[in-house]
């Protein structure tokens, strides 16, 4: 499954809805949106939640001009929070669906095994035992050139994002200054030239 966010040069990108209408289910376009899905891992089932938007230059960056950039920055903060809220909602809905399906399956199994008490199944699933991993996709890094806290890092901490993936940076100085973590959030720089144009395994 493929997830895509808008970059700073993607002028062809009209809107997430128009892109979805064009591509169908082949790609999930995230622009202030979030989603979640259940996957199977070697350790068992896990819920992966994705949210994303373009983000923007942060205040304090040498290229940030308040007169022209502040309103765009504020808008991208709203889109980021909308994506994180939608991620959380998608996780809740997925948990409800998993619980409902499990109850139906358990009911069928119990009816089939009414003659053998040793084969009785529990009436509910411990949905809270399924771990959730929250991944936020941004084009811009969530901080300025000094790696100073920003509105984006505030949201990352508030919504307990596990991994933040971003790009935009294409110079060695930036490559060297990016931290591996911000608080409890893992940071992944995935600019193509930084990765030598190779795929990056996140988890």
Predicted segments, located by residue:
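Binuclear metal-dependent phosphoesterase catalytic core
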Residues: 17, 37-44, 71, 85, ...
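Divalent metal-coordination and catalytic microenvironments
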Residues: 2, 7, 50, 168, ...
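Binuclear metal-dependent hydrolase catalytic cores centered on His/Asp/Glu-rich metal-binding motifs
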Residues: 44-127, 200-202
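Core catalytic region of metal-dependent phosphoesterases/phosphodiesterases
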Residues: 1-43, 150-161, 190-192
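Active-site-proximal beta-strand elements of phosphoester/diester hydrolases
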Residues: 47-56, 135-137, 186-192
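Active-site environment of divalent metal-dependent phosphoester hydrolases
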Residues: 8-16, 36-37, 57-61, 141-149, ...
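Active-site-proximal segments of metal-dependent phosphoesterases and phosphodiesterases across multiple
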Residues: 57-67, 95, 125-161
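Short coil/turn segments at beta-strand junctions that form active-site/ligand-binding loops
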Residues: 1, 46, 130-133
